[in-house]
């Protein structure tokens, strides 16, 4: 099976392969396959729509990790008209799992911070598979405070399995770095918009995820643990990940129903990886609209609303 396709995408892969074969055949003399190609392309559109209309939570979890899914830097290249990356935590190192810097979206200057995974093995190792160490979160905090100093709105793109759990991270106080970010983000005197673009995993996601608006792409996830991790703990069997995904209620649609996020941003048919340009344009439009709306909110009201949001997380009623 093509590694760029998930198992449930195999019918799509087969149709695309047939279309490619016909295109190759049409390069020969006196061969016209336009009618057949159009028929297959129509079938492809219908089959793709059918598959993506009925996705399970586990399938959405797989899409959130799709190897071709756009990452933070991919979105930055389209969403931002200008971007100047800033590096380092000014204490130890520059964690490549977190990228951030000054940006301009349209006429709007902003600070943008996000998790960054890698495309190939070399980059995955350099980016630590998108799992930040304490210095990554301290770099993020440095940029947040810089944004506050200059009155720049803060945008964060969330896409991580979680914070790095290695001994080196624990030695440098990973939990303190995450906790400090949570405290500081709750009090930032600037508008903050957080967008889950892929995986939103546990405290590693929350450490750049406290804000005035929380958005999720349609096929992203947000959870306290991965489905595999949950299955290993509850059932001692990672193969039950699909059951765990359902129980975790980690999809954008379910989280919107619970009131834990503010907006679900629709993805192109087949997912963001099938049309990254279109997805980035949609994201840009939504971010500009949200920034404009937050411009009208007085700072005191903004902070009060942010604190109220945080206090409602985890609240429930007995029936």
Curated annotation (Swiss-Prot):
Reaction catalysed by this enzyme: N(6)-carboxybiotinyl-L-lysyl-[protein] + acetyl-CoA = N(6)-biotinyl-L-lysyl-[protein] + malonyl-CoA
Cellular component terms (Gene Ontology): acetyl-CoA carboxylase complex
Subcellular location per the Swiss-Prot or TrEMBL entry: Cytoplasm
Any one biological process term the GO annotation gives: fatty acid biosynthetic process
Entry's EC annotation: 2.1.3.15
GO molecular-function term, one example from the UniProt record: carboxyl- or carbamoyltransferase activity
Pfam families on file: ACCA
Origin superkingdom: Bacteria
Alphabetized UniProt keyword annotations: ATP-binding, Cytoplasm, Fatty acid biosynthesis, Fatty acid metabolism, Lipid biosynthesis, Lipid metabolism, Nucleotide-binding, Transferase
Chief subcellular location: cytoplasm
Domain CoA carboxyltransferase C-terminal: 32-293
InterPro entries hit by this protein: Acetyl_CoA_COase_a_su, ClpP/crotonase-like_dom_sf, COA_CT_C
PROSITE patterns reported for this sequence: COA_CT_CTER (PS50989)
Pathway: Lipid metabolism; malonyl-CoA biosynthesis; malonyl-CoA from acetyl-CoA: step 1/1
PANTHER family named among the record's database cross-references: ACETYL-COENZYME A CARBOXYLASE CARBOXYL TRANSFERASE SUBUNIT ALPHA, ACETYL-COENZYME A CARBOXYLASE CARBOXYL TRANSFERASE SUBUNIT ALPHA, CHLOROPLASTIC
HAMAP family, sorted: AcetylCoA_CT_alpha
UniProt similarity note: Belongs to the AccA family.
Function, as annotated: Component of the acetyl coenzyme A carboxylase (ACC) complex. First, biotin carboxylase catalyzes the carboxylation of biotin on its carrier protein (BCCP) and then the CO(2) group is transferred by the carboxyltransferase to acetyl-CoA to form malonyl-CoA.
Subunit structure: Acetyl-CoA carboxylase is a heterohexamer composed of biotin carboxyl carrier protein (AccB), biotin carboxylase (AccC) and two subunits each of ACCase subunit alpha (AccA) and ACCase subunit beta (AccD).
Protein name per Swiss-Prot or TrEMBL: Acetyl-coenzyme A carboxylase carboxyl transferase subunit alpha
High-level lineage: Bacteria, Pseudomonadati, Pseudomonadota, Gammaproteobacteria, Lysobacterales
Gene transcribed to yield this protein: accA
């Amino acid at each position: 099976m093509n590694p760029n396709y998930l198992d449930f995408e195999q019918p799509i892969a087969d149709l695309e392969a047939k279309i490619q074969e016909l295109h190759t055949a049409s390069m020969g003399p006196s061969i016209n396959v336009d009618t057949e190609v159009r028929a297959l392309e129509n079938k492809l559109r219908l089959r793709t729509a059918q598959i993506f209309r009925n996705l399970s939570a586990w399938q959405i979890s797989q899409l959130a990790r799709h190897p071709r899914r756009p990452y933070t830097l991919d979105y930055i290249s389209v969403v931002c008209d200008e971007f100047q990356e800033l590096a380092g935590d000014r204490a130890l190192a520059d964690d490549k799992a977190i990228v951030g810097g000054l940006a301009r979206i349209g006429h709007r200057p902003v600070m943008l911070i996000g998790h960054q995974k890698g495309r190939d093995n070399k980059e995955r190792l350099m980016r630590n598979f998108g799992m930040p160490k304490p210095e990554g979160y301290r770099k993020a905090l440095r940029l947040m405070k810089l944004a506050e100093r200059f009155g720049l709105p803060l945008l964060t793109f969330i896409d991580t399995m979680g914070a790095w759990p290695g001994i080196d991270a624990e030695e440098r106080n990973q939990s303190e770095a995450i906790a400090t970010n949570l405290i500081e983000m709750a009090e930032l005197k600037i508008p903050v918009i957080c967008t889950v673009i892929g995986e939103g995993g546990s405290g590693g996601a929350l450490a750049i995820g406290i804000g005035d608006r929380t958005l999720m792409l349609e096929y992203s996830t947000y959870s306290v643990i991965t489905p595999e991790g949950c299955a290993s703990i509850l059932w001692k069997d990672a193969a039950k990940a699909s059951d765990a995904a359902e129980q975790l209620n980690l999809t954008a649609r379910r989280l919107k129903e619970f009131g834990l996020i503010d907006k679900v941003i629709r993805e192109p048919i087949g997912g963001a990886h099938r049309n990254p340009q279109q997805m980035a344009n949609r994201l840009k439009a939504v971010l500009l609209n949200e920034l404009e709306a937050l411009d009208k909110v007085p700072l005191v009201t903004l902070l009060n609303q942010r604190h109220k949001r945080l206090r409602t997380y985890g609240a429930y009623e007995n029936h």
